[in-house]
Amino acid sequence: MSNWLKLEGDVCAVTGALGGMGAEICREFARNGANVVMLDLDEEKVKAAAADLAAEFGIHAEGYKMNATDEAEVQAAVDATIANFGRVDVLVNTAGILRFAAMEDLPLSDWEQVLNVNLTGYFITSQRFGREMIKAGQGRLVHISTVASHSPETFSGVYSSTKAGVNMMSKMLAAEWGPYGVRSNCVEPCFVKTPMSANFYADPEVEKSRSRLIATRRIGEVSDIANAVMFLASKRSDFTTGDAIKVDGGFSNMMGDLTAKPGGRRAYADNFLKNKGVELWSDESGVAKPSDQ
């Protein structure tokens, strides 16, 4: 256990705690000596997961059933947290859903459902847990957003719009609650392996082609996201608020390489990388061959 992050003894609540990212974030908190409040829809599973976490790491962990879009359930989770722990220091919002559709075909019901879970749910949990932080004069909020909040992924329906909303909500919370000692920040992942995406990356060609779009040439792991969350949730980031950390392996910096290059520049780049033993951009990535440029 490391105390560099100064998380030992803190009370850290995590929504979507049974998901890939949420579960890893809970484990990382516990590994750093924090007490953990696991929040998710399945009461039996979340209580069992909390018991396992407590037994493994010797910390205090509780699991509560909570639908982030239900004000009464959120308030009940807040009340239970205060009753059992006395306070809450950190809230991490990870719950989220995605519905694929072209905008002209997107049913209003899908729009409303994704908006409700991805944005309204983040607001409700932030507001209710945030009130306790304001009373205490300190607290840290971390919200899982996405690089797609800046550059939309087509046919992902309202997903990118909701995450852009999360970014601005976080800035609003940071601005309004900063005087009370409460900070709010986002983490923006790119391609990440989770149980939800396991089938997608089961095809090695999919993973290979996507990896080539990333500067580090690999798909992210949930541990990469958890590490960034730990920093923003810790006292080591006390002067950071209203901001976002991209955890995308440099994907956002590679846009220039996704376009055709004039003359022999693409051929030069490909030959240079090949001589260095580095993976080249592939046809599957959508980048034209040098001969096509």
Roles of regions detected by a PLM:
Residues 131, 175-179, 238:
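Alpha-helical segment proximal to the catalytic Tyr-Lys
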Residues 186, 208-240, 247-249, 276-293:
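C-terminal helical subdomain
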Residues 102-103, 110-115, 210:
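Substrate-binding pocket helix/loop in short-chain dehydrogenase/reductase
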Residues 4-37:
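Canonical Rossmann dinucleotide-binding motif of NAD(H)/NADP(H)-dependent dehydrogenases/reductases
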Residues 126, 162, 170:
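Active-site helix of classical SDR
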Residues 98, 106, 152-161, 172, ...:
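Active-site loop-to-helix junction immediately N-terminal to the catalytic Tyr of the SDR YXXXK motif
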Residues 146:
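Residue(s) in the substrate-gating loop at a strand-loop-helix junction
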